[in-house]
Design a protein with these regions (language model features):
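Structural signal for interior beta-strand "rungs" in well-ordered beta-sheet cores
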Residues: 58-60, 64-159
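Terminal amphipathic alpha-helical/low-complexity segments used for targeting or macromolecular assembly
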Residues: 1-61, 150, 155-166
Length: 166
């Protein structure tokens, strides 16, 4: 199986039945996600971001990845990521789909539409939706919904114009 296979099997077993929602920090859901991420870290997936087979690893974790996706960031172990065809996710994008706020642990899905581009070091928080043909500038933080064909930037990200695709 190898390290990646063990990480996938472990994460899928640990996170079976996990749903988007708000949970207690340090509670069973939080600890299950934490342990699944430690397994993924130990597998070396983070070091292989950008490798062609990373898309297959993402799919094995339960994420929905379209054809022709250019994935340069580690996928979430939760399996709650959906990326449309021909989209691009640059390096070091936070796709984890969870965050801690005080004593609460928030988990949610992330949706990236077809032909969208996510700039390097961007954070997509749980529940973030990036529409088709949309662009998000590097270093942005997307909290809500980026509509189709829009260009967003900043932290928190705000609309800055129309997306420019070649």
């Amino acid at each position: 199986l190898g390290r990646m296979g063990i990480a996938v099997l472990g994460a899928r077993a640990l996170l079976s039945g996990l749903k988007p929602g708000t949970y207690r920090r340090g509670g069973p859901e939080h600890l299950r996600v934490w342990l699944a991420e430690r397994l993924a870290d130990a597998s070396g997936a983070e070091n292989q971001a950008g490798a062609p087979w990373l898309v297959y690893y993402a799919r094995a974790l339960g994420n929905s990845i379209g054809k022709g996706v250019d994935l340069h960031s580690a996928p979430p172990v939760t399996g709650m990521l959906s990326i449309g065809h021909r989209s691009s996710v640059e390096p070091e994008v936070d796709l984890s789909g969870h965050w801690i706020d005080g004593d609460q642990f928030h988990v949610g899905g992330i949706t990236i539409g077809t032909d969208a581009t996510i700039g390097a070091r961007t954070a997509l928080l749980p529940g973030a939706v990036v529409g088709k043909n949309a662009d998000v500038a590097p270093g942005s933080a997307v909290v809500g919904k980026v509509k189709n064909g829009q260009y967003w930037k900043g932290s928190p990200a705000v609309k800055s114009g129309k997306a420019r695709h070649p």
